[in-house]
């Protein structure tokens, strides 16, 4: 296995769009798709953004010893679970790219080690992030504003300065100008790929 480039950031930081654009510019990176029990959103595709599964499938993977890390969020719509499974995606020699949370990054770092897991933390000023989140939610057929607010507040705790420091996150990519942010990330990944 090559390196795993792991994108993270608070909700509405632009990480999903950045992830897609980085994959376009670096097609040699293979993707890791994580799992979730939450409902699929408009515009998402099963197996692309996430594998959308139910609790029964999660239990099967747990019993098979395949779940690397698991997070549960008590949302206003019930408990949503997100997890990474060692389901064959990590068996390749390719460099990989994934998207997740700081919590999942810490667990994956324990599983794979510092040498293999490269953090890419995307930062956006909170006011701009809230504005983006609200615009995105308004476009949904059934906007979930309460959940948007819960996520926004939870992110403040989940991505606190102390937690970023404890996780060893020292570099931040500021997403003020998305094209510039993407260029910086692509350059950083290319440099790390050369030192494998």
Predicted regions and their residues:
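Pre-Walker A (Motif I) flank of P-loop NTPase domains
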Residues: 1-4, 93-94
């Amino acid at each position: 296995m090559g390196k795993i480039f792991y994108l993270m950031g608070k909700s509405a930081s632009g990480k999903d769009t950045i992830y897609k654009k980085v994959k376009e510019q670096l097609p040699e990176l293979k993707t890791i798709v994580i799992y979730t029990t939450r409902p699929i959103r408009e515009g998402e595709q099963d197996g692309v953004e996430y594998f959308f599964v139910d609790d029964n499938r999660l239990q099967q993977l747990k019993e098979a010893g395949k779940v690397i890390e698991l997070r549960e969020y008590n949302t206003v719509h019930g408990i949503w679970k997100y997890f990474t499974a060692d389901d064959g995606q990590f068996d390749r020699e390719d460099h990989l790219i994934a998207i997740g949370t700081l919590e999942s990054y810490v667990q994956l770092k324990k599983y794979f080690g510092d040498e293999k897991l490269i953090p890419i933390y995307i930062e956006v000023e909170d006011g701009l992030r809230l504005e983006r989140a609200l615009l995105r939610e308004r476009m949904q057929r059934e906007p979930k504003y309460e959940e948007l607010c819960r996520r926004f507040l939870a992110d403040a705790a989940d991505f606190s300065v102390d937690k970023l420091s404890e996780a060893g996150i020292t570099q931040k990519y500021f997403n003020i100008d998305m094209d510039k942010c993407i260029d910086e990330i692509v350059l950083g990944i290319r440099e790390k790929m050369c030192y494998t």
